[in-house]
Amino acid sequence: MAVPARTCGASRPGPARTARPWPGCGPHPGPGTRRPTSGPPRPLWLLLPLLPLLAAPGASAYSFPQQHTMQHWARRLEQEVDGVMRIFGGVQQLREIYKDNRNLFEVQENEPQKLVEKVAGDIESLLDRKVQALKRLADAAENFQKAHRWQDNIKEEDIVYYDAKADAELDDPESEDVERGSKASTLRLDFIEDPNFKNKVNYSYAAVQIPTDIYKGSTVILNELNWTEALENVFMENRRQDPTLLWQVFGSATGVTRYYPATPWRAPKKIDLYDVRRRPWYIQGASSPKDMVIIVDVSGSVSGLTLKLMKTSVCEMLDTLSDDDYVNVASFNEKAQPVSCFTHLVQANVRNKKVFKEAVQGMVAKGTTGYKAGFEYAFDQLQNSNITRANCNKMIMMFTDGGEDRVQDVFEKYNWPNRTVRVFTFSVGQHNYDVTPLQWMACANKGYYFEIPSIGAIRINTQEYLDVLGRPMVLAGKEAKQVQWTNVYEDALGLGLVVTGTLPVFNLTQDGPGEKKNQLILGVMGIDVALNDIKRLTPNYTLGANGYVFAIDLNGYVLLHPNLKPQTTNFREPVTLDFLDAELEDENKEEIRRSMIDGNKGHKQIRTLVKSLDERYIDEVTRNYTWVPIRSTNYSLGLVLPPYSTFYLQANLSDQILQVKLPISKLKDFEFLLPSSFESEGHVFIAPREYCKDLNASDNNTEFLKNFIELMEKVTPDSKQCNNFLLHNLILDTGITQQLVERVWRDQDLNTYSLLAVFAATDGGITRVFPNKAAEDWTENPEPFNASFYRRSLDNHGYVFKPPHQDALLRPLELENDTVGILVSTAVELSLGRRTLRPAVVGVKLDLEAWAEKFKVLASNRTHQDQPQKCGPNSHCEMDCEVNNEDLLCVLIDDGGFLVLSNQNHQWDQVGRFFSEVDANLMLALYNNSFYTRKESYDYQAACAPQPPGNLGAAPRGVFVPTVADFLNLAWWTSAAAWSLFQQLLYGLIYHSWFQADPAEAEGSPETRESSCVMKQTQYYFGSVNASYNAIIDCGNCSRLFHAQRLTNTNLLFVVAEKPLCSQCEAGRLLQKETHSDGPEQCELVQRPRYRRGPHICFDYNATEDTSDCGRGASFPPSLGVLVSLQLLLLLGLPPRPQPQVLVHASRRL
C-alpha cells in the first residue's frame, strides 16, 4: 500500500495520533540539495518548542508518552521481575540451605601463586621424563650408526621390518610393491586397541614409513633400515621406564621414519605425501632459526613452463620455514622488487606465508637477467637491523634458468671475507645454459647448488638445504644437543594435538684416522606429548566456571588455553593461536604476554572484556592473572581467576557416612539422582565429568546418568578408582538442590506467574530442572561450566535474561507447542565469615507468549489489572504499549542487542534475533547514542564449507597445455622444451595432489571436507549510557521519537518508539553474525609486529666446517618403458601409477 505523502504542519496518518508538525520539517531544501535519509538521533529537548502542540486542546486522544511515564513503566517491569525471582528463584533460601548444611562441606582457598607454581612444576616434571627418554634414544642412535658397517651389496630380502604402509598397499592390487612382489621382507603384525594412542598398536615392534617418492630398495635406504633396527630395543626400554610415553620417533635425513609402537600408517585416499623432513618438529630440530631471502629470476628467458616450476618451488621452500624463521621473496630482472606488500623480512608464520604464496602466482617473466640487482636487494634485506628477525642463519635462495654473470663484485662488497650469508642456487627447468656460474656462486658462499629439471624434483631439492644448515650444529657436538619443544600441531597418526620434544642426532663417524669428523646430521629424534596429558595436570573444577590455566611459548602462541579449539587442522602447518587472539586484546594483556615471553613471574588484576561461550555477548569483568615460567622449557604458565573464585566448596562427607562400606548408591542423598525421584523432585542432569576411571562416557546425558548409577552400585565412597572431590561434591549438590525443591519449588504454582520451569545449577555438576516434564525442552549444556547462562550469571550482578537462540538461517520460532521460553538466571553469592563465593546459579524459564502479554500490561496506563485506561474525545492521554501497539513499538532488548520481548504480536517469533534484523533504524539509533558499543575480533580457528573447485575440467594447476599446432609440429616434439613439458605433464598427473590439495584430505574428499578459515565476529554490549534518554531519529518526514532506559538489576534495555510508517529511511544494518574474512590486513600488521623472542641458542658458524661439498644436480633418468607405458595409459584414459625414484643422494652414504 502506498504511504501518503507528508507535508510540514500536517498530522501523521491514522486516527489515534495527535496533530503536530513532523519533526525535521522546515524550509524545503533548495534545488540540487538532498535531505539525508538518516542521521543521528537528536535529544528530545530540541523538540521542546513542539511539546505544546503534542498536547494542544482539541487534539486527538493520544500523544507520545512523557519521560516520567516511561520511567514508571520501567520501574513496574523491574519490580515484576524481581518479585518473581525472589519467590521462585530461591536465592535467599538456597543461601540458608548451604548454611544449614555447613557441616557437610569445607571452604578451600585458591592461592594463585602457589597453585601456578605447582602446576608449572608438574608440567616440568612431565616434560623432563620425556627429555631423559629422548637423550637415551639420541645417544643410542649415534652409537648404533657409528658401529654400523656400510654394505654395498645389501638386498631387500636381507632386511626384515614392519612396513607401516604394507597393509594398505596389499589391499591395493595396483600397488607397485604388490606388482614387484617385494613383500618377503615385511612383517605381518597383530594389533590391539590402545585408548592412549587412539589407535591399534603393537608394543613388540616399531614401524617404518618411507615416503612414496623414495625407492625403498635403494642401497642408502636399506643400510638406513639396517642400523636403525637396533633402536627398537631402546624404544621398548624407554616405555618400560615410563609407561606414559606416547610416540617415539626417529626421523632420518634420508626420509625414513621409524616410530614406536608399531601401528598401520593412516594412508590417504590420494598419494601419501608424508615426508618426516617436512614436518614442523623435524625442521625445528634439524637447524637453528633462519633469515631467508628468496629471489626469483623473472627475465624474459624464463619460459612459461620454467616460471611455473619456479613458482611451485618457492611455495615448497616456504613450507620448510617455521615461526622462528623470517623471510622475504623478491623477483628480479633488470631491477629487483618484492613480490608482495612486505618490504622487509617478516615472520614465516602461516598467514604471512599465505600472502607470499598468493603473490608469487602473479609473477610475470619479462626483461633481461640482472643477478646483481637481485643479490644487492637480498643483501640489503639481510643487513637491515631496524626490524625484528631471527638473527641466526642468513641465506639467499636464488631460482633461475641460468646465466653467465657471477656477480663477484657483489659478494666481495657484502659477504666476503667472512661469508656470513650462505647462497643457495637453483637451476630450474630443462635448458642448455652453462650452470658453472651458479655452482660457483653457491660454493664461494658456503651454500649449495641444486637442479630442478621437472616437477618431481621440487620437494627433495627444496628441503635438502637443511643438511647444510645443520653442519655447524653437528660440529658443535654436545653443546648443540639441546632439547627443543615445538609449537602445537596435529599428530599424523591420529593422537590429536601434540607438542614434540626434539633432539638432533649427529653422525659421529670419521673417514679415517686423523680425518675431519663427519658433519652430516643423521636426523631428529622426537617424543610426542599430547595436550590432553598436560591438561590433566591442571586443576579443572576448583577454579570455577570462569577460572582457567593457560600457557604460551616464546612466540606468544598458546600451548594451553580453553579457547584453543581448532575446528579443523592443516596437516602441514602447526596450530598457531596467539594469546592475544585467544582472548580479546587490550594493553594489559599485551604487558602480561610480554612478561611471560621474557620468562618473568608476575601478578596483575585487570578489568577486561570477555566473550561469552556462545560468542553472542561481551562482558566487562575483573580478572586476576598470575604467571610463572616453566623451567627447562620455552613455555610460560598463567592462571586466571575471577575474584569470586578465590574460594570454593569441598564436600566433607562425615566419618559416619564414609564408614559405611556399602556402595555409594546407599548414601542418603544419592536417591535423588535416581530417575524414580524425578517426578516429585525435578529432573537432574549431571555434568559428564571423569568421576571414576571405569565410568563410560556418553554424549547422551540420560545414558551417562544410567552408566553412572550402575557404577555407583559397585563403588564405595572412598574408592581409589574415583575422584573423591568430584564425586562427593556431586552428591552434596544433589542433596542441596533437592532441599530447594522441598522448601521452595514444590509448593508454588508456576502457572500463576506464567513460568515453564525453575532450575538450579551448581559448581558440583548438578543441574536440577523442575518440574520433570520441563526437562524435555531443556537445551542447555548439562555441564554447568560449559553453559553460557551459568558463566554469564557468575560474571554479572542481578538477573541475566537469555532469549532462545535463533540460527543464522533466521527461521522463526515455533510457538505452537507453548514451550518456547526465556531463561532468567542469577548467581547465588554465599558469604561464610569473610569468605565470599558463588557456588550456584538459579533461575526461571518464562513462557514467552504469556510474558509478552504481561509486558504490554506492565508498560501501559492501566490503573488496575482488568481496567484499561479510557480517553474521551476532549481528554488528553498518552499512548501506551498495550492500547496503542499499532502506533507504538515497545521492546526489551538484552545487552547483546537481541530481542527479548515485544508488544508486537508479529514479532514474537523473532525473539532471540539481533534487533537490527527486526528494526534496523532503531538499533542504529541506539548504537549511535552509545547505548551499545561494538567489539570486532577474528576467529582464526573457524571451519568453512568447501568452496566449489574453480578448475573443473581443466588441466592440473601449474601445467602448461600445448596447442594442437604444437603437437603437430615435429620440431616442437624434438625440442628440449617439449621433453621438459612431457616430464612436467607426467609428474604433474602423478603427483599433482601436491599442488592441488592438502595431504590432510585423507579424511575426506575436497568436495565434502571443511577447511580452516578466518571469520570476523562482531558483538555488541552496553555502552556508557545508564540514564533514561529521549531522542529523535531524524529522517525528514519519516522521523521517529524514541525513549530508552536500562532496567535496574538486569541486562535489559527498555525501548519505546514510534513505529515507522515509511521505508524510505532504511539505513545500513548493523551486523552481528559471523562473516567470512581474510583477517586483518597482513601488510599493515607486519609494520607493528607483536613482541616475541627466538630460541636462545644459535648454530650458524663453525670454523672447521668443510664447504667443499657444495653442489650437484638431481634429475630423474627416464625409463623408456615407463614413459611409453605412461603415455599409453594417458591415451587410454587410465590413471598412472607412480614409479619408484631414487631420491636419496650419494652423499647420504652412512
From Swiss-Prot:
Query: Subunit arrangement?
Result: Dimer formed of alpha-2-2 and delta-2 chains; disulfide-linked. Voltage-dependent calcium channels are multisubunit complexes, consisting of alpha-1 (CACNA1), alpha-2 (CACNA2D), beta (CACNB) and delta (CACNA2D) subunits in a 1:1:1:1 ratio.
Pfam families listed in its UniProt record: VGCC_alpha2 (PF08473), VWA (PF00092), VWA_N (PF08399)
State the associated disorder. Cerebellar atrophy with seizures and variable developmental delay: An autosomal recessive neurologic disorder characterized by cerebellar ataxia, atrophy of the cerebellar vermis, severe refractory seizures with early onset, and global developmental delay compatible with epileptic encephalopathy in most patients. Disease severity is variable and normal cognitive development has also been reported.
Annotated stretches, region: Disordered: 1-41
What are the GO MF terms of this UniProt record? metal ion binding; voltage-gated calcium channel activity
Its biological purpose: The alpha-2/delta subunit of voltage-dependent calcium channels regulates calcium current density and activation/inactivation kinetics of the calcium channel. Acts as a regulatory subunit for P/Q-type calcium channel (CACNA1A), N-type (CACNA1B), L-type (CACNA1C OR CACNA1D) and possibly T-type (CACNA1G). Overexpression induces apoptosis.
Instruction: Give me the segments passing through the membrane.
Output: 1114-1134
Q: Which UniProt keywords apply?
A: Calcium, Calcium channel, Calcium transport, Disease variant, Disulfide bond, Epilepsy, Glycoprotein, Ion channel, Ion transport, Membrane, Metal-binding, Signal, Transmembrane, Transmembrane helix, Transport, Voltage-gated channel
What organism is the protein native to? Homo sapiens
Q: From the Swiss-Prot or TrEMBL record, give the protein name.
A: Voltage-dependent calcium channel subunit alpha-2/delta-2
Recorded topology in the membrane: Single-pass type I membrane protein
Instruction: Fetch the SMART domains from UniProt.
Output: VWA (SM00327)
Query: What are the annotated disulfide bridges?
Result: 443-1098
- Please give the GO cellular component terms listed in this UniProt entry: GABA-ergic synapse; plasma membrane; presynaptic active zone membrane; voltage-gated calcium channel complex
> What tissue specificity is annotated for this entry?
Predominantly present in cerebellar cortex. Present in various lung tumor cell lines, while it is absent in normal lung (at protein level). Highly expressed in heart, lung, testis, pancreas and skeletal muscle. Also expressed in kidney, liver, placenta and brain.
